[in-house]
Amino acid sequence: MRIVLIGAGNLATQLGKALRGVHHEVVQVYSRTKDHAQHLADLLNAGYTDSLDQLVPDAECYVFAVKDQVLPAVIKQVCGLYADGSSALFVHTAGSISFDVFPKETKYYGVLYPMQTFSKQRDVDFTDIPVFIEGNSDETSNKLEVLAHSFSKSVYRLSSADRRYLHLSAVWACNFVNHCYDVASEVLAPIGVPFEVMLPLIDETARKVHELSPREAQTGPAVRYDERVMNAQLALMKDHPMLQDIYRLLSQSIHENSRHADMPTCRHLDIST
């Protein structure tokens, strides 16, 4: 399939490599930053442009992998230029945006959402990445399914309404968790302990949920309702009231989700120190 890749960021970079790896032809890369477009195009042996009105007009698929904030405007402009009478697929890759962002005059449009965290500098194997698709018709969905199956063995059809919850779940499981890693790193820095000491703990925590439910795998002072430990740790964060608030709320949530009926609640946890 001849594909135009609109975007040159983290997802666009890794998706472009995956598509080329299974013998699709990425014919062109667009980015509003010309150097970014050229860099990715060089990796994919493709043409490049920083102007939407200079896209290849006869591609079979236009993949939008740009920031959510600009996606509607970019889609409107591209479809206005190229969609009328076209048999090409027009698809975006955003987890949180509905497929009806496409103009209705577009014949074939939808969503192809690979649920994974992506970075330009870290290559990933798309084979096991779940890909969620949605098309504006059965014909479109079938085309998207074939495209997705060309690089992933885990392809699911999911509506825009349900994909909102999938994306929310991913934010909890990935983005918030990574922020906690960052907080942990900041806690260690003043005492000169490298973040690498946390990696075995992080790895085992991730491995456990392959065998146990997250609730069964939960450990820590909030589960045990260990007020002494929790209040002592809150005291260590006395100069960081936002972190205290986060610690308190997470501890309350953990405890409420895991406690037995005969265990006390920790909603009165003292955080005044």
What are these regions (language model features)?
Residues 27-31, 89-94, 112, 131-133, ...:
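Short, hydrophobic beta-strand segments that form beta-sheet elements in well-ordered domains
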Residues 189, 203-262:
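Interdomain hinge/lid region at the active-site interface
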Residues 1-54:
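NAD(P)+-binding Rossmann beta1-loop-alpha1 motif at the extreme N-terminus of oxidoreductases
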Residues 259, 263-267, 271-273:
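Short polybasic linear motifs
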Residues 42-123:
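Rossmann-like NAD(P)(H) cofactor-binding subdomain of soluble oxidoreductases
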Residues 36-43, 123-168, 173-210:
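Internal alpha-helical scaffold of NAD(P)-dependent oxidoreductase catalytic cores
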